[in-house]
């Protein structure tokens, strides 16, 4: 929650609530409570540093006692201090009020409240805003799309040349530097009524803006200001398209413009808070369609008129950020409004990133891509110890530090993310502006052509953001664009472009065949039947580097189906702003079997190609004749023995479902050099044997069409695919957490000079800040337990594993393990032994069930029914339970006695009495997995933290190898791992419990 500005007067009185903006959610009391709570948190943090704080906060009649424990005891035991402080503040304020009343009586000002003067930077800000408003309005009167400075000297010498309409009563037009604070505030409040009109037409003036708001402003007394009439006419929006769209940053026209005198007087008291509120508030987009309602009543909400005063706020913030002088430094240092600061930092980042790309307009920064590929963009001049993130994640202190270094911050692009940013396609939110547009033609045809040119990446004089394709596009006038669809283009004749216009008439609803002009290959003419000559032709010039990408826009009332002149095997896409035609007049042009609906189909096709590529390469590595499904879990579990060579730089081996379009295409480009390496064939020997003998467990074969992998899951219901997918995601996340845990332990052991990995004492490091320095982590990722990270951050950590380094600056208790404690030094060995014991138990349990393959043990069911399964041959004093709870010595003893261990199923565990005897019959059922509940380790206390974080990972790490290599029947999964909510089937035969 951000405070709207700095108070100019530190006194407390009954009029102070007016200085707080009423639009802040929750009101002033909630803000004060929140700030006092934050102050109390700071005192608590200071107490941890052996610092005592005592603080008294006074607001009107309420007093808050904040501080450390000793500080609060001190203040509570001395109530006279609070009373003295309260009398001091109230007495001083009353004295100031009396002096103010006397001064007002002397000056003869009885009913007008005094406006406190703020710092010099604040009056500069108001004058700058007024100057920006005058320049924008003057440029609009000239018909210019760019900003033209107002010739104040010429206007003063020739009063009749320029007429200013809508200025507040008693204020004449002059230079903004000559206005006082009160006049500036009134001008800003009535900025939506102000209009410039050229009395003497110049060569530059083309047309005069017409707006209904000209007719509803109070009359003025100045000679250069013409009073406006009180009548209001309803005008359609199309008659003045530039009045609302040519303003910088698309400021909406207000629909409530009448003001009451009382509201005008009270709003003059807002000072810097009003300035900050004007910079922060944005008019809602819903007001855009209400332009015709000029005579609406003023909203009773206080401060609602201030929401209309954002005409040039973003333009002004851009000037503040890029001003080389120190004129705005004091304003940036003094303001406490986090929204203004974040907006400034956002403008700074976007402009610097655009400058690095060589563009002359701001471009949104791809924060997520930069976070995933920090080596692609180098950021110079950034403040120390501040990571580069989205501005919305910074607080006020960091935002101010960034703005202090704004002139030194520069971006350097080392590798590009997406070339489409230069193509002017739908993925750029800010497009280039041009000053060469003309406003003299018909508004309707001009708007339609401008929309078409904007979609093709052409800059136009009108607001390019109105025509840029985005997710927020809504149907509107012809100058706006509707929803966008991607259509696959196919044409038998490359010289013919086929265009279908459904719904225009019975004669033109079919397909129009147009011959492409061969004289200029860069010009394509599209003729829409049934329209006028002014709107039927669109001749866009293709500036995109990709000649296969064509963007076409037509009026909103027409639906278009466009076919491009490309070969069928090279699919490309065109933007279709029309609706899907259910009548199917253009369905003849489409091949329904090859139709691609959008990006989702593209990425699915790419993932299928990469999946087939991996299966072929894996089959080649193991000597199989056909494609074999890759056991991804095995490769993630044993990265030193199973790995892949030849992948593109920065791309780790994972399932194709984890990649995006960019990485999938890069993998396909490097397909010839990709090679699977298997150092330990015994890890995949079971799957290899199945492939060699061609058993039902065979994972795939070569299809003639596109080598699609067919396995047992293709004959199963769809729930099994979802089942395996969910298990694979859980297994991937748990495996990544375990790998990061091992990485941290290894790096921590190296920092201590110990041969083996050492368990990282996360809590002790947190309680002793500065004792251990961790370097090399990706930007924006703090150091904490791996079990608290998601898969994306875990992958980013593993990608920079070589750069991560631990440095111990000062020792503390528990930093170095005891020399006689071998378990702490053999933590990595414990993880391996635990997995071996799990595999041993699963194998023994599978034999006890009469199966020829391992089965996952339902430890929870066995614990609840200890008489159901008997385990023989266990070492002395070692009970049978989940291996996660064993310490290192017990794991070693179990492995030594593995030949003597046997399991005997005395009675079947519910609900599997009859099902287990006939596993092949049960193949159907809508079941889904649930993650196992974590249980606290009962083993060694030193490695308890590791066991807790990896209990679920180790328990589920066996699932994917079993399901992928053998496809264990669902009857072998324990009951608590299944969800029977969607099960709707009949079991074969009666069940005897």
From Swiss-Prot:
Membrane-crossing residue ranges in chain numbering: none
Coiled coil: none
Tissue expression remark: Uniformly expressed in the embryo in pre- and early gastrula stages. Enriched in the head region of early neurula through tailbud stages.
Gene3D superfamilies the UniProt entry points to: GTF2I-like (3.90.1460.10)
GO-annotated cellular components: nucleus; transcription regulator complex
Organism for this UniProt entry: Xenopus laevis
Assembly: Interacts (via repeats 4-5) with foxh1/fast1 (via Fork-head domain). Interacts with smad2 and smad3 (via MH1 domain) in a ligand (activin)-dependent manner. Interacts with pou5f1.1/oct-25 to form a repression complex on the promoters of the gsc and mix2 genes.
Record field: compositional bias (Low complexity): 938-961
Its biological purpose: Transcription factor that activates a subset of organizer-specific genes. Binds to the distal element (DE) of the gsc promoter to regulate its expression. In the presence of pou5f1.1/oct-25, forms a repression complex on the promoter of the gsc and mix2 genes to inhibit their transcription.
GO biological-process terms attached to the record: negative regulation of DNA-templated transcription; negative regulation of transcription by RNA polymerase II; positive regulation of DNA-templated transcription; positive regulation of transcription by RNA polymerase II; regulation of activin receptor signaling pathway; transcription by RNA polymerase II
Keywords: Activator, Developmental protein, DNA-binding, Nucleus, Repeat, Repressor, Transcription, Transcription regulation
Signal sequence coordinates: none
Keyword Repeat: yes
GO terms of molecular function: DNA-binding transcription factor activity; DNA-binding transcription factor binding; RNA polymerase II-specific DNA-binding transcription factor binding; SMAD binding; transcription cis-regulatory region binding
Stated name of the protein: General transcription factor II-I repeat domain-containing protein 1
Motif residue range(s): Nuclear localization signal: 929-936
Family, similarity comment: Belongs to the TFII-I family.
Record-linked InterPro entries: GTF2I, GTF2I-like_rpt_sf, TF_II-I
GTF2I-like repeats: 117-211, 332-426, 597-691, 727-821, 824-918
Region spans: Disordered: 461-480, 916-961
Keyword Hydrolase set for record: no
Compartments, record wording: Nucleus
């Amino acid at each position: 929650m951000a405070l709207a500005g700095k108070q100019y007067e530190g006194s407390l009185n009954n009029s102070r609530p007016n200085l707080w903006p009423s639009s802040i959610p929750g009101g002033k009391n909630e803000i004060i409570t929140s700030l006092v709570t934050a102050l109390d948190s700071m005192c608590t943090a200071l107490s941890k540093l052996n610092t005592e704080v005592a603080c008294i906060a006074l607001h009107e009649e309420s007093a808050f006692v904040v501080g450390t424990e000793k500080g609060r005891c001190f203040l509570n035991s001395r109530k006279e201090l609070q009373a003295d402080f309260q009398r001091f503040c109230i007495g001083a304020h009353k004295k100031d009020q009396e002096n103010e009343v006397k001064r007002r009586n002397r000056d003869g000002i009885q009913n007008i409240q005094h406006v406190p003067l703020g710092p010099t930077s604040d009056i500069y800000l108001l004058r700058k805003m007024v100057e920006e408003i005058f320049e924008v309005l003057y440029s609009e009167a000239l018909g210019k799309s760019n900003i033209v400075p107002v010739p104040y000297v010429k206007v003063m010498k020739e009063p009749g040349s320029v007429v200013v309409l809508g200025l507040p009563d008693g204020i004449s037009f002059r230079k903004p530097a000559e206005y006082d604070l009160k006049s500036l505030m009134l001008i800003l409040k009535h900025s939506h009524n102000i209009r410039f009109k050229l009395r003497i037409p110049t060569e530059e003036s083309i047309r005069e803006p017409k707006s209904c708001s000209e007719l509803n402003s109070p009359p003025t007394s100045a000679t250069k200001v013409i009073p406006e009439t009180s009548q209001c006419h309803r005008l359609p929006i199309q008659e003045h398209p530039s009045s609302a769209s040519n303003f910088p940053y698309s400021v909406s026209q207000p629909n409530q413009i009448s003001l009451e005198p009382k509201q005008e007087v009270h709003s003059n008291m807002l000072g810097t808070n009003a300035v900050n509120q004007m910079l922060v508030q944005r008019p809602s987009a819903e007001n855009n369609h209400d332009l015709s309602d000029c005579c609406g009543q003023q909203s009773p909400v206080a401060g609602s008129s201030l929401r209309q005063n954002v005409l040039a706020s973003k333009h002004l913030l851009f000037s503040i950020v890029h001003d080389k002088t120190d004129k705005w430094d004091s304003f940036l240092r003094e303001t406490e409004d986090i929204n203004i600061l974040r907006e400034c930092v956002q403008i700074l980042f976007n402009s610097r990133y655009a400058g690095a790309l060589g563009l002359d307009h701001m471009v949104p920064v791809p924060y997520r891509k930069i976070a995933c590929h920090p080596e692609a963009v180098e950021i110079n001049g950034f403040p120390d110890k501040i990571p580069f993130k989205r501005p919305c994640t910074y607080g006020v202190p960091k935002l101010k530090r960034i703005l202090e270094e704004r002139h030194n911050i520069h971006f350097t692009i080392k590798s590009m993310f997406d070339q489409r940013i230069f193509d002017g396609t739908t993925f750029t939110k800010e497009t280039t502006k041009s000053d060469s547009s003309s406003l003299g033609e018909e508004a309707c045809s001009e708007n339609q052509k401008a929309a078409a040119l904007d979609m093709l990446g052409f800059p136009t004089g009108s607001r390019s953001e109105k025509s840029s394709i985005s997710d927020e596009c809504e149907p509107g006038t012809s100058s706006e664009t509707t929803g966008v669809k991607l259509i696959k283009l196919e044409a038998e004749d490359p010289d013919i472009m086929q265009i279908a216009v459904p719904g225009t008439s019975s004669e033109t609803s079919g397909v129009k065949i147009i011959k492409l002009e061969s004289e200029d290959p860069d010009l394509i003419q599209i003729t829409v039947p049934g329209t006028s000559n002014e709107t039927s032709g669109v001749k866009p010039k293709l500036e995109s580097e990709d000649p296969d990408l064509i963007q076409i826009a037509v009026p909103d009332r027409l639906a278009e189906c466009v076919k491009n002149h490309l070969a069928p095997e090279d699919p490309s896409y065109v933007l279709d702003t029309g609706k899907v035609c259910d009548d199917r007049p253009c369905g003849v042009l489409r091949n329904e079997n090859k139709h691609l609906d959008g990006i989702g189909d593209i990425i699915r096709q790419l993932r299928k190609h990469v999946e087939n590529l991996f299966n072929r390469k894996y089959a080649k590595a193991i000597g199989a004749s056909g494609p074999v499904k890759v056991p991804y879990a095995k490769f993630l579990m044993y990265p030193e023995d199973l790995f892949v060579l030849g992948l593109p730089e920065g791309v780790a081996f994972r399932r194709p479902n984890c990649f995006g379009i960019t990485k999938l295409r890069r993998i396909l480009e490097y397909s010839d050099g990709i090679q699977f390496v298997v150092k330990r064939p015994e890890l995949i020997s079971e799957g290899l044997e199945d492939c060699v003998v061609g058993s039902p467990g065979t994972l795939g074969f070569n299809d003639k069409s596109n080598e699609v992998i067919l396995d047992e899951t293709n004959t199963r219901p769809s729930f099994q695919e979802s089942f395996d997918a969910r298990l694979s995601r859980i297994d991937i996340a748990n495996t990544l957490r375990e790998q990061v845990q091992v990485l941290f332990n290894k790096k921590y052991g190296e920092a201590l000079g110990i041969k083996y990995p050492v368990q990282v004492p996360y809590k002790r490091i947190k309680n002793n800040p500065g004792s251990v320095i961790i370097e090399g982590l990706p930007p924006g990722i703090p150091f904490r337990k791996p079990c608290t990270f998601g898969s994306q951050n875990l992958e980013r950590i593993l990608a920079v594993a070589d750069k991560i380094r631990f440095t111990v600056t000062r020792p503390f208790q528990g930093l170095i393990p005891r020399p006689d404690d071998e378990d702490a030094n053999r933590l990595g060995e414990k993880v391996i032994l635990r997995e071996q014991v799990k595999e041993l138990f699963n194998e023994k349990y599978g034999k006890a069930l009469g199966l020829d393959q391992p089965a996952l043990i339902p430890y929870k069911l066995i614990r609840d029914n200890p008489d159901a399964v008997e385990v023989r041959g266990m070492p002395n004093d070692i009970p049978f339970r989940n291996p996660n709870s064993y310490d290192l010595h017990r794991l070693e003893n179990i492995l030594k006695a593995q030949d003597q261990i046997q399991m005997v199923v005395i009675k079947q565990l519910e609900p599997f009495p009859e099902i287990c005897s006939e596993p092949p019959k049960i193949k159907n059922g809508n079941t889904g997995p649930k993650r196992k509940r974590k249980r606290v380790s009962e083993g060694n206390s030193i490695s308890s933290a590791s066991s807790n974080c990896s209990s679920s990972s180790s328990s589920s790490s066996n699932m994917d190898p079993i399901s992928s290599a053998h496809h264990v029947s669902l009857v072998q999964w324990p009951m608590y791992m299944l969800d029977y909510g969607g099960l709707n089937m009949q079991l074969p035969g009666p069940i005897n419990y």
